[in-house]
């Protein structure tokens, strides 16, 4: 194409993404847009076309971002190229959202006409504003009997401060208002700014592993252009590759010869190792490289750590491969090998949050067929020792001994909960129970409140979200962000079975709750660990002090069965002999800990 054609084509490109809270109808709206632009025939349409993973369809949530190229003929008779980048809405996947937004110029903000603005909506809007995107508000689900479009309009104006007077009322399910949205995209979203004659700069916003083509990168061209056969260079790692294939998704993948400014597509260059393609890196040409990198994404730091161990020890290498492949498309997953006396060899993995952790586990079990044992999730603590050294502890078993610890700091988050005002009491009680500090409370309208607390992250990671949902009948929504580390009175609690510490059951707890937690866990383990031929003491200890104990009674054979009414000394002889045997057994016996026991350490708050 000559320069003029390229410039005209560039003016016709619109890159946008859809942002919304979970369940506000983002994926359904994406389906309707695909249908309206004729990307898919009615026969090929299925619910949530862009959610390709089985897990996404089952849970009805979007996990991975997706990019699609659509052709749309607008009312002015011109044909436009729209790139729709679908994003997840759940708090754990904010980094997926921030990656999508970096590749766009506009965003459609979907708000549920019945529920109004939720915590996640706000968080995503702020992300979009940080990226200077044009935001188009859309009020979805107007066909619901409880929909109140005017109230939601007012809310968008009051809470976010966007002008919502021309927000499009739509129903993605019934297909109402889709055309107006497309017209608004063409009108309001600016075309990509970029210079086709400059050296190539392309932003990698996602990558995945394909068994045949190696690593495939999803890219957005910012300046210049790239053709099949070009030698390209990754700017972060400095490695060079030859482009073997370029493609666009219309949801069906189609190969193209070149990608130009503003295009969103995929690039494969027979890249074999996962580490060579970093999400957020810039691709440029090896011959005439760009001078600077594009402002990429910030590196996402894991918030939650837990150990993953294969139940079958022989599958250790398979687990490593599985994690490497998942890490490809999931920039936020981190892992390193670790060993545990109780569980053998495995990995310490870092995740963004509990949903992220659950999904990775489920994907490993499904896609790679590996059965896992998981240990209790923990966060990173900063421990200052008496000698003045600061250690970062992501695993309770790495905690130094009590007498060597001077102080421990734990991460705190600022949690914003949006809720109907009937549940304010229940939420405040829950946050107080989780060691939260009350910061602020705002009424959004007459029925809804935003409550802000500062809470230790370790209290949120396990079941805070579930408890929040159950204490508000599912109406509350949560968003949280890290605010830094603070000193806390924390201790490490060890669990001893048969007087030996089981490293995988250790956890870190606030000193005030140590006694209660110890008691609950000891009772739980007593119920879960199968009885042995000898009695097993179960103890919870803080340092050298035992704070709770329970005993799993021994199974015993009835040795007196064949003594009919016999002599007491005969019975005593048999019982003494049995007692001797049990004593010997206890010295050499080892205790098997079932998987449920590890999980029970997690779910102790439910009692």
From Swiss-Prot:
<dbReference type="InterPro" id="IPR035654">
    <property type="entry name" value="LepA_IV"/>
</dbReference>
<dbReference type="InterPro" id="IPR013842">
    <property type="entry name" value="LepA_CTD"/>
</dbReference>
<dbReference type="GO" id="GO:0003924">
    <property type="term" value="F:GTPase activity"/>
</dbReference>
<dbReference type="InterPro" id="IPR009000">
    <property type="entry name" value="Transl_B-barrel_sf"/>
</dbReference>
<keyword id="KW-0648">Protein biosynthesis</keyword>
<dbReference type="InterPro" id="IPR004161">
    <property type="entry name" value="EFTu-like_2"/>
</dbReference>
<dbReference type="GO" id="GO:0003746">
    <property type="term" value="F:translation elongation factor activity"/>
</dbReference>
<dbReference type="GO" id="GO:0005886">
    <property type="term" value="C:plasma membrane"/>
</dbReference>
<dbReference type="GO" id="GO:0045727">
    <property type="term" value="P:positive regulation of translation"/>
</dbReference>
<dbReference type="InterPro" id="IPR027417">
    <property type="entry name" value="P-loop_NTPase"/>
</dbReference>
<keyword id="KW-0342">GTP-binding</keyword>
<dbReference type="InterPro" id="IPR000640">
    <property type="entry name" value="EFG_V-like"/>
</dbReference>
<dbReference type="InterPro" id="IPR038363">
    <property type="entry name" value="LepA_C_sf"/>
</dbReference>
<keyword id="KW-0378">Hydrolase</keyword>
<comment type="function">
    <text>Required for accurate and efficient protein synthesis under certain stress conditions. May act as a fidelity factor of the translation reaction, by catalyzing a one-codon backward translocation of tRNAs on improperly translocated ribosomes. Back-translocation proceeds from a post-translocation (POST) complex to a pre-translocation (PRE) complex, thus giving elongation factor G a second chance to translocate the tRNAs correctly. Binds to ribosomes in a GTP-dependent manner.</text>
</comment>
<dbReference type="Pfam" id="PF00009">
    <property type="entry name" value="GTP_EFTU"/>
</dbReference>
<dbReference type="GO" id="GO:0005525">
    <property type="term" value="F:GTP binding"/>
</dbReference>
<keyword id="KW-1003">Cell membrane</keyword>
<feature type="binding site">
    <location>
        <begin position="23"/>
        <end position="28"/>
    </location>
    <ligand>
        <name>GTP</name>
    </ligand>
</feature>
<keyword id="KW-0472">Membrane</keyword>
<dbReference type="InterPro" id="IPR031157">
    <property type="entry name" value="G_TR_CS"/>
</dbReference>
<comment type="similarity">
    <text>Belongs to the TRAFAC class translation factor GTPase superfamily. Classic translation factor GTPase family. LepA subfamily.</text>
</comment>
<feature type="domain" description="tr-type G">
    <location>
        <begin position="11"/>
        <end position="193"/>
    </location>
</feature>
<dbReference type="Pfam" id="PF00679">
    <property type="entry name" value="EFG_C"/>
</dbReference>
<protein>
    <recommendedName>
        <fullName>Elongation factor 4</fullName>
        <ecNumber>3.6.5.n1</ecNumber>
    </recommendedName>
</protein>
<dbReference type="InterPro" id="IPR035647">
    <property type="entry name" value="EFG_III/V"/>
</dbReference>
<dbReference type="Pfam" id="PF06421">
    <property type="entry name" value="LepA_C"/>
</dbReference>
<dbReference type="Pfam" id="PF03144">
    <property type="entry name" value="GTP_EFTU_D2"/>
</dbReference>
<feature type="binding site">
    <location>
        <begin position="140"/>
        <end position="143"/>
    </location>
    <ligand>
        <name>GTP</name>
    </ligand>
</feature>
<dbReference type="InterPro" id="IPR006297">
    <property type="entry name" value="EF-4"/>
</dbReference>
<keyword id="KW-0547">Nucleotide-binding</keyword>
<dbReference type="GO" id="GO:0043022">
    <property type="term" value="F:ribosome binding"/>
</dbReference>
<dbReference type="InterPro" id="IPR000795">
    <property type="entry name" value="T_Tr_GTP-bd_dom"/>
</dbReference>
<dbReference type="InterPro" id="IPR005225">
    <property type="entry name" value="Small_GTP-bd"/>
</dbReference>
């Amino acid at each position: 194409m000559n320069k003029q054609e390229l410039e005209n084509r560039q003016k016709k490109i619109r890159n946008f993404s859809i942002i919304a809270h979970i369940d506000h109808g983002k994926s359904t709206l994406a389906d309707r847009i695909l249908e309206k632009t004729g990307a898919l025939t009615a026969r090929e349409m299925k619910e949530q076309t862009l959610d390709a993973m089985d897990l996404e369809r089952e849970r009805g949530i979007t996990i991975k971002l997706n990019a699609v190229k659509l052709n749309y003929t607008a009312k002015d008779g011109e044909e436009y190229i729209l790139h729709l980048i679908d994003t997840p809405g759940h708090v754990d996947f904010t980094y997926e959202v921030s990656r999508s937004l970096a590749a766009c110029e506009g965003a459609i903000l979907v708000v549920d006409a019945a529920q109004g603005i939720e915590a996640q909506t706000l968080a995503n809007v702020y992300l979009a504003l940080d990226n200077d995107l044009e935001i188009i508000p859309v009020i979805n689900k107007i066909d619901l009997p409880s929909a109140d479009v005017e109230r939601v309009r007012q809310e968008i104006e009051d809470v976010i401060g966007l002008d919502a007077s021309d927000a499009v009322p739509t129903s993605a399910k019934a297909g109402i208002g889709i055309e107006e949205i497309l017209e608004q995209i063409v009108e309001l979203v600016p075309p990509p700014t970029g210079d086709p004659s400059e050296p190539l700069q392309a932003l990698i916003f996602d990558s995945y592993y394909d068994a045949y083509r190696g690593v495939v990168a999803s890219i957005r061209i910012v300046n210049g252009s790239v053709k099949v056969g070009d030698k390209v260079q990754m700017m972060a790692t400095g490695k060079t590759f030859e482009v073997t294939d370029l493609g666009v998704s219309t949801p069906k993948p189609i190969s193209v010869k070149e990608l130009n400014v503003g295009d969103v597509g995929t690039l494969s260059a027979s890249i074999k190792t996962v580490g060579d393609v970093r999400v957020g890196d810039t691709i440029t040409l090896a011959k005439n490289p760009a001078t600077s990198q594009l402002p990429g994404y910030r590196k996402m730091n894991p918030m939650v750590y837990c150990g993953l161990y294969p139940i079958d020890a022989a599958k250790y290498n398979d687990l490593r491969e599985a994690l490497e492949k998942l890490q490809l498309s999931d920039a936020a997953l981190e892992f390193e090998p670790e060993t545990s006396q109780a569980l053998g060899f495995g990995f310490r993995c870092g995740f963004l949050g509990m949903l992220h952790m659950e999904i990775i586990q489920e994907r490993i079990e499904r896609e790679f067929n590996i059965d896992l044992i998981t240990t209790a999730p923990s966060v990173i603590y900063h421990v200052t020792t008496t000698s003045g050294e600061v250690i970062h502890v992501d695993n309770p078993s790495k905690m130094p001994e009590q007498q060597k610890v001077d102080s421990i700091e734990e991460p705190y988050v600022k949690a914003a909960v949006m809720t109907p005002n009937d549940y304010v009491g229940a939420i405040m009680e829950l946050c107080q129970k989780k060691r939260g500090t009350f910061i602020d409370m705002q009424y959004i309208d007459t029925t809804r409140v935003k409550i802000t607390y500062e809470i230790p992250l370790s209290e949120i990671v396990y079941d805070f979200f579930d408890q929040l949902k159950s204490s508000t009948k599912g109406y509350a929504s949560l968003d949280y962000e890290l605010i830094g580390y603070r000193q806390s009175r924390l201790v490490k609690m060890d669990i001893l079975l048969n007087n030996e510490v089981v490293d995988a059951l250790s956890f870190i707890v606030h000193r005030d709750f140590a006694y209660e937690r110890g008691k609950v866990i000891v009772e739980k383990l007593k119920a879960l660990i199968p009885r042995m031929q000898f009695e097993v003491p179960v103890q919870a200890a803080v340092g050298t002090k035992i704070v709770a104990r329970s005993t799993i009674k021994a199974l015993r054979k009835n040795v007196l069965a064949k003594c009919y009414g016999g002599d007491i000394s005969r019975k005593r002889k048999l019982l003494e002999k049995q007692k001797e045997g049990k004593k010997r057994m206890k010295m050499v016996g080892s205790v098997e800990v079932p998987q449920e026991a590890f999980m029970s350490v997690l779910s102790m708050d439910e009692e």
